[in-house]
Amino acid sequence: RDLTGDWSSDVCSSDLSSVGSVSLAVASSVPGSTSSTVCSTSDCTIAYAESGFIFDVPTLIAARPQSDIALRAVKKSDTSQACVPGFANVTRSLSFTSAYINPGTGTQPVMVNNSPVTSSPSSLNLTFDSTGTTLLTVRYDDAGQMTLAAQYDGTTANGDVGLSMSGSDVFVSKPYGLCLQTASSCTVAGVNDNCQVFAKAGDSFPLRIQAVGWQADGEPLTAGNLCSNHIITPNFQMSDITLNSALVAPVSGDSGTLSPPQYSHVLGNQTTTSTSISEVGVFRLTATPTANGYFGETVSGGESGLVGRFIPAYLGVQANASLTSSCGSSFSYQGQPMAFAIGQEPTLTVTGFNRSASITHNYDRGAFWRLATPVPNAYTSITGKTSLDVSGRLTRSGTANLAQSGADDGDGAERYRWSGETLQYTPALLPLADDYPFIAAIRQTFSAATLTDTDGACFGDGNSCSAYSYDFSDSPGSEVRLGRLRLDNAHGSELQALDLPLRIETWQNLAGGSFRVEGLDTCTTAAVLQTPALSSYTGQLSQQNYGNDKVTLIAPSAGLGLLRLQPPGINGSVLGGLPATPSWLFYDWNGKGREAATGLARFGIYRGSSPMIFRREVYR
């Protein structure tokens, strides 16, 4: 540079657009210098340092503007990061670009001071203060890891042609929360018109999850907020986000298990995962990303609306019952009512199950139990003997008293017990081989309709509804015998007592079928047979002179007893009987149907049959 004029000192400026050093010297002077050049730096060398921009974009929440981000013009080689002279209190035009890092593509620009910044440079006029600092407002309407870069190139107007300054920062933008949605239309938790059946417990249903941006600070992370008027952040992806469920109804019920316990959010507007809940009820679902799991940052999750109602996939049914012998501990007679064994009355247990065959413990909670009281069909005989198993041979009597139990105890089941009835086989009019002693074999059936609740959950394989049958247990059970009470005839002197033999017999498989004395009878007692009676007087006997007080019952023992008639002192005959004889000991004595037995007592000398003359004519 040429310096002319009369002066003792001068100030000049020098700049260099690249990093390096410049040496100063006096090439010539007029008049000439008699001494060497003296500089404030050693060797008269000026060092030019690399300059650039430093700024730090903090972690953003998608769609939420972040203001007051300081961008500073600094000397990069200067550890004190002092401002470069010439950028104080000036306005400069900087070019900004953005780039996708993870994921590597996207659709949204980075907004800097409300101007979109993409991979193509965008110029912004920025005013730097005395410290070389300007403030930025940055917003990004998506999620992911991004780079924001700033560039300044000197101009003639600014007197810094050739100057190049740059700076960049990698930042993370995360969703505000996760919007969880299902096809459930439940708005009021419970069993009502506003919470219809949604799915069966254990069956899969689609759970739709969207990562969404910010709309307002402090907004609750619920579906009602996040799933309405929020932008979607399709660039959000993250693995192993925890899924959970919270029971809303029934209160104090079993929370069940949500499956799967986690999911991976993939790129795109929505991630749909196939989900199932193991229990009956109404729930809310939550998604919770792992803490510090998104580029070192924690992403907020979200909560669904009401999801339900869930019902059992199917109903399981079990039943049991047993009879007990009515004539002691050995057997019952045909026609004799057989009671249910104590504690073994017909009992039906209905249990709700999910698709995995696990009990739905909430099914018996309050109104979630949707099965009306099952109505059993008629009892049927299944002895395998045609005449015994025919419709109508087995009958029941008495009134069934229903007791229902098990509600609200959280085992998913309720029990129905019917008591007060007795069963009996109608006695055969004429004994057959089928009537030899047999074990009572009873089956009870419930129709598919009566085992289907009002939501359609029913007994079956989970795909179709079925009727249910079960067989009575033989423990203790009862053997059944065809029996009769028989009174034999007798005759004797009118001066002596006369006994009519009494025999209790049962039909046995002996000699091709015959009635034999039943020595095991313990139920035909004097109290059962009550007072004997006389009827059908002949000869000199009449009710007036020979009433019921003249006959006495000697109760049967081991199947044998008698009616003892006092001596009348006059001739005649009379029928002795037991009017209170139980109907199961009736028999068709006279071909007129089953009736109680009578025995004929004859007093006096017996003449025998009336004399008859037989004549035979032979024709040749």
Which residues are covered by each model-predicted region?
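Core sequence-specific DNA-binding domains of diverse transcription factors
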Residues: R1, S9-R620
